[in-house]
Every structure is written in structure tokens, then in C-alpha cells.
Amino acid sequence: MFRIISKATLFQDSQRFHTSILSPRCAFHNGGILHKKAKDKDVKHDHDPEFANSFNKMLKSFEAKMQLVHEKLAKRFQEAVVLPSQGNFTQLEALFIPSKSIKAPTPSRLLREIAAVSQKGSQQIIIRPFEDVDIKNILKAIEDSRYPFVANKLNASTIEVKPQRTTLESRQQLAKVLEGYAKDSREQLSAMRTELKKEIAKNKKSKAWTSDDCYKAEAEMQTAFKNAINLLDSGLKSALKKVI
């Protein structure tokens, strides 16, 4: 005798078949889980905390060093750019003077460390060295400086300084000085980048970092370097506008 199978029973059997095929015990599905685990492992490696912490320290140090270069350059720009009255006063104070005084702790010191500098009106600056032996060196340093000043010895212990009227030639000369400062700073930044490149290469050689890690590190380093160069160029452009 044949058993009559209803459509409902056939549908239920079909559902059970498909359910068994898609069950976690199926080799295909287990393979999918293994693939997912492997993928998750790769993702975890991409965010390896050991690499991230190590490189972040290097990058922060790199950025901090570049920041110091920028700050020093900004200060040099500020001192070099000819400004009215107070600017001239600040420029003179920032001059380095070879000192022959036996009391001098170093062979070269700032003018403000070896003399009293005061401003008398907008067109006259008076310098009184603490020791008369430094007068000759101060006069020579002012004469050799890039600043448009005329210095005269009033007496044995006093120097008078008057700003010269700036000319196109003197402004162009000062612009070259500013560009020289920027070039020096750019070279310092490049040297810092080279040092960081060596550190990255060292980690790659020792296999402390993977090739992907090193690629990411170099990319971030290059981005930080480009930003630093752009900031430098912007500072130079701003300083040149005040000169020419």
C-alpha cells in the first residue's frame, strides 16, 4: 500500500533539508566562519597596539622637534624684519657680540647681556657697554650686521645708533637673509625626516614592524613633513611681505 504524502509534508521535508545544509555543522559554513576569523585577525593586526604605540611616540617626537624649528625661525623672522622704533631696539638687543671681557662666561654673548640699550626718541638708540673693552666689538658687530643702522662712538663709554632709511637694495638684501633662514630650517626638517626614515627602516629590517606597518609609518611621516614645510613657506611669505 502506498502512503499518500501531502504537499504540507513535502514542504516541511524541504525546509528541514535546507536547514541542515545551512547548519553550522556544514563544511561550507564552517569554512565561512574560519574565513571570518582570519579576516578578523587581519583587522586586528592592522590596528596592532604595539606598532601604534611605538610609532606614535616617534611621530610625536618628530613633530615636537619640527615645532621647535618653526618657533626658532619665527623668532628670527621677527628680529630680522625692520619694524618701527621698538623693532630696531629688539634687533639690536638680539645681536651677538664677541666679548673680550675676562668676566664673560662665553666668547660670544647677546648685546643686552654686555650693555645697557635704551631708546631715545624714535630715531636714536644709546648703547652703554658694562665694560669699555667691549665698545670696539659692538661697533664692528653693528657695522657687519644686516640691519640698516649707523653706529657712532660718542665717548669712551657710549655708542649712538641711528636707523638708516631703508632702500630697495637694503630690503632686497634683508629678503635674502630671510630666505637663508628658511633654507636652514628646511634643511633641519629634512635631516629630521631622514632620521625617522632610518628608524622605520630599522624596524622593518628587524621585522619588528610588517611591511604594511612601515608603509603606513612612512605615509604619516611624509604628511607631517609636508605640513611642516607648508607652515615654513607660509611664515617666509608673511615675513617677506613686511620687507618688500
Curated annotation (Swiss-Prot):
One GO term (biological process): mitochondrial translational termination
Keywords: Mitochondrion, Protein biosynthesis, Transit peptide
GO CC annotations on file: mitochondrial matrix; mitochondrion
Molecular functions (GO terms): ribosomal large subunit binding; translation termination factor activity
Lineage: superkingdom: Eukaryota
Stored InterPro entries: Ribosome_recyc_fac (IPR002661), Ribosome_recyc_fac_dom (IPR023584), RRF_sf (IPR036191)
Subcellular locations according to the entry: Mitochondrion
PANTHER family: MITOCHONDRIAL RIBOSOME RECYCLING FACTOR PSEUDO 1 (PTHR20982:SF3), RIBOSOME RECYCLING FACTOR (PTHR20982)
Protein's job: Necessary for protein synthesis in mitochondria. Functions as a ribosome recycling factor in mitochondria.
Family, similarity comment: Belongs to the RRF family.
UniProt-recorded name of the protein: Putative ribosomal recycling factor, mitochondrial
Species in which this protein is naturally found: Schizosaccharomyces pombe (strain 972 / ATCC 24843)
Lineage: Eukaryota, Fungi, Dikarya, Ascomycota, Taphrinomycotina
Name of the gene this protein is made from: rrf1
